[in-house]
Amino acid sequence: MTAPKATILSSDEIRRALTRIAHEIIERNKGAENLAIIGVHTRGIPLAERLASKLSELEGVEVPRGMLDITLYRDDLSEVARQPIIRETQVPFDLADRRVILVDDVLYTGRTVRAALDALIDLGRPEGIQLAVLVDRGHRELPIRADYVGKNLPTAKHEVVKVKLQETDGTDIVELFDPEDLQ
């Protein structure tokens, strides 16, 4: 793998973006009462953990957190792998009467979010669902929009946005690549 085309967010910029998103969530929801944070595998989970911790720190209430595997809800499952890896879904609380903040790293076509919404609705009927993403790169194929965005990043369709997080990759950074640079 060669050097990235550009660094989109540094570690400090990721931290600041998540802090801003936490404040926006609190403002829109008039606090953190009745909120729950659910991260989409894989990198949505550590982002959700960080957001939940920040919300708890700012509001003084424990925000329930969960993780969602959308593998079986994807509309491209046959293209992903012959034997898809099924990860764990953990939502150890009742969704009823909660506003759920669904968290993912990158919003692109909207298909991952659509699958996450299907998976979430199968678990219960929350009061509402809001979407928080670290990067929105455009190119939507479905009518889906994030409620909270760390960075809007217009990209070419062929470009690749790579999010690396301390919990999964040992570092916090968001980089932009041309596909041939990832070979």
Curated annotation (Swiss-Prot):
Pfam family membership, one: Pribosyltran
InterPro entries: PRibTrfase_dom, PRTase-like, PyrR, PyrR_bifunctional
A single MF term (Gene Ontology): uracil phosphoribosyltransferase activity
List of residues binding substrate: T42, R43, R87, D104, D105, V106, L107, Y108, T109, G110, R111, T112, R137, V161
UniProt KW Transcription keyword: yes
Documented EC number(s): 2.4.2.9
GO biological process, one term: regulation of DNA-templated transcription
Main enzyme class: transferase
Catalysed reaction, written as an equation: UMP + diphosphate = 5-phospho-alpha-D-ribose 1-diphosphate + uracil
UniProt signal peptide: none
Sequence motif PRPP-binding, location on chain: 100-112
Keywords tagged on the record: Glycosyltransferase, Transcription, Transcription regulation, Transferase
Classification via NCBIfam families: PRK05205.1-1, PRK05205.1-3, PRK05205.1-4, PRK05205.1-5
Described function: Regulates the transcription of the pyrimidine nucleotide (pyr) operon in response to exogenous pyrimidines.
Family: Belongs to the purine/pyrimidine phosphoribosyltransferase family. PyrR subfamily.
Record's protein name: Bifunctional protein PyrR
Organism: Deinococcus radiodurans (strain ATCC 13939 / DSM 20539 / JCM 16871 / CCUG 27074 / LMG 4051 / NBRC 15346 / NCIMB 9279 / VKM B-1422 / R1)
